[in-house]
Amino acid sequence: MMTTTVDQTAIDPITFEVLRNGLDAIADEMAYTLVRSARSTMIKDCMVYSAALCTASGDLIAQAVNFPVMLCSTPDALYIVADKFRDNLAPGDCIILSDPYEGGSHLPDIFMFTP
């Protein structure tokens, strides 16, 4: 019988908070950039958008402080994109997805993913 051990390195609370707040700040900057460059009144005035950082496997690691309900369909959309483009993505690529049958909840949902 084979046993495996998992090396769980503990992280001190201060380092954890510094990293967590840094990731949250990145997500917030993504959201602010979207608002500053948007032409849609739904984004600029109604603030109906979300921004988040996810792992390559689709797990959420940080989200901007805005409309979090939009993040509910993000993992499904990310899985679709990862499945179709996983082997062909390079730094600088941006995949735009607007398909209610492929992860979005309705047609106006637009997802942008970058590796």
Locations of the language-model features?
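Glycine/proline-enriched, intrinsically flexible loops and inter-domain linkers
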Residues: M2-P91, I96-P115
